[in-house]
Amino acid sequence: MSEKVIDVQDAWRERALIDDAKYKEMYAASVSDPETFWAEHGRRIDWSTPFSKVKNTSFAPGNVSIKWFEDGKTNVALNCIDRHLETRGDQTAIIWEGDDPNESQHITYKQLHAEVCRMANVLRNRGVGKGDRVTLYLPMIPEAAYAMLACARLGAIHAIVFGGFSPDSLASRIKGCGSKLVITADEGLRGGRKVPLKANVDEAIKRLDADLVDHVIVVKRTGGNVAMEPGRDVYYHEAAEQVTDECPAEAVEAEHPLFILYTSGSTGQPKGVVHTTGGYLVYASMTHQYVFDYHDGDVYWCTADVGWVTGHSYIVYGPLANGATTLMFEGIPTYPSNSRFWEVIDKHKVNIFYTAPTAIRSLMGGGEGPVKKTSRASLRVLGSVGEPINPEAWDWYYRVVGDSRCSIVDTWWQTETGGILITPLPGATKLKPGSATRPFFGVQPVMVDAEGKELDGACEGNLCIKDSWPGQMRTVYGDHERFEQTYFSTYKNLYFTGDGARRDADGYYWITGRVDDVINVSGHRMGTAEVESSLVAHPKVSEAAVVGYPHNVKGQGIYAYVTLNEGEDGSDELRKELVTWVRKDIGPIASPDLIQFAPGLPKTRSGKIMRRILRKIAEDDFGSLGDTSTLAEPAVVDDLIENRQNRSA
């Protein structure tokens, strides 16, 4: 692991909202007296009924209960739109950049208000009200944000299903939350290719009870010819012509659910993560402001999809609650060329950029040329999210993309946490490439060993969180017992993140990967992220994923999937070279037993590597790979199976 330290530059410190002394003071206050701390910061949003109770939380076995600001009432859409109209009605709220570089729009707060009210009225006319669930299955178009905020305006609960999910996955999620109304588009556009969204919705509904879904609202994106079921389906533009652009916002309790978002469970059955209104918005807006050092007038771009929690918290809710200008991108980093990200940054003068390590690594594989063709002079803060970023990719991001003048915030958090938990702050934190550094305000990480004993000082172990924070999920939809079992039964009175971590002598946290991504080689536990980082540090390697597989002698062997940089070819010589490289870097125990050169790795559209699939292939067991429709490129799996290194026959 890299222990290089990058000091806070004077330019970052001078304009930062928080310096090191302020961080330490605020952090100490947040953990010693959370009631007072969050009472103050809870007022960063507007309340129609002010709260008098701040924190009412318990992680006790059999009695897990999380409530924040519970006697207050508010409305998320009111906070994200209406309260800005007087002072910044004509400011751009959303910059939309289409898949095609010639398509973009600027949507002001006034326009956003009108569009959201219109969408809310369309929903209301179809019987949607407080507490009803609405499934959204949309591309990255402005209507996705309008639909989220329209549900929030009415007190309805949105459940977004990412546009890459199959009809089966969509059906199980519609059924899981009992949505009577689905909002979709005729087709999506992604990297120049069309995605048959409406056709997938039709397929999904066929798999459900006939009386479940009453209405399907279809946004015209491509104008493609799609089947419309009379009486059930309606084009959004036609329905919107029948309503006004004024709609009152429903004041809801702080603990009223805002959204359900399904995330993969270890059993393969997705869990409906429930986030509520008040605490979630306080936490999303506060982390957005301080982590990205957001100043009025900044242009902020998070490259995620709204189908993932990052898109919920850091494209829509956090930025808009702060009156920010947030960029929403329909496309992919490599279309029409692999300069696209950097061209968008120059086109819209982006100041803050938040993306995933997997995107950074894949662009890094194409060399510096595509980056250097652009200026990127507007950039000030670069963020990373989704998985641990290896030091080499961190360094490339810092040096090449940011010209060694932008602060990097390597953020660690989860769907379940609602917002960022461990992160540097641009004006406060010395940086170590590969480390998520220190906890955000109110977050108390603890390291425990396998027996649940709390570890002190520099150590490696299981990452847990002691005590609650306002953005924390409240339950698994319809299954509170599963919530308790999954997150609170492993270690008593602690929230177990499922991640392993290392804490160094400076109190910095290094996330080592999911605990189920730990390989046990001859009795030695090893985080896959460490071996992956070592492989990616080799000059010929663009990306690597490491999994365990059954080994006659060691119990588990190390199987590495390696994607090489453009222009490099895989060979037995290179295999040997990589084994020697890792052996030298980490030690003989970490030497890969099998290396498979792969043109690509199976990733979800949000960029997460599907390790479950890689493990199955490494185990020579690919008869039960499960649903691969969520992958960005399902064909990658066929290549991996075809060229696997561990054939039993």
UniProtKB/Swiss-Prot annotation:
Pfam families: ACAS_N, AMP-binding, AMP-binding_C
CDD domains given in the database record: ACS
Positions with a binding annotation for Mg(2+): 536, 538, 541
Modified-residue entries (N6-acetyllysine), positions: 608
GO BP terms in the entry: acetyl-CoA biosynthetic process from acetate
Coiled coil: none
One GO CC term on file: cytosol
Post-translational modification: Acetylated. Deacetylation by the SIR2-homolog deacetylase activates the enzyme.
Entry keywords, A to Z: Acetylation, ATP-binding, Ligase, Magnesium, Metal-binding, Nucleotide-binding
Family membership noted in the UniProt record: Belongs to the ATP-dependent AMP-binding enzyme family.
Cofactor(s) in the UniProt record: Mg(2+)
Signal peptide location: none
Gene: acsA
Catalytic activity: acetate + ATP + CoA = acetyl-CoA + AMP + diphosphate
Residues reported in the UniProt entry to bind CoA: 190-193, 310, 522, 583
Entry binding sites for ATP: 386-388, 410-415, 499, 514, 525
Name of this protein: Acetyl-coenzyme A synthetase
GO MF term set: acetate-CoA ligase activity; AMP binding; ATP binding; metal ion binding
Organism: Methylorubrum populi (strain ATCC BAA-705 / NCIMB 13946 / BJ001) (Methylobacterium populi)
PANTHER family associated with the record: ACETYL-COENZYME A SYNTHETASE, ACETYL-COENZYME A SYNTHETASE 1
NCBIfam families: Ac_CoA_lig_AcsA, PRK00174.1
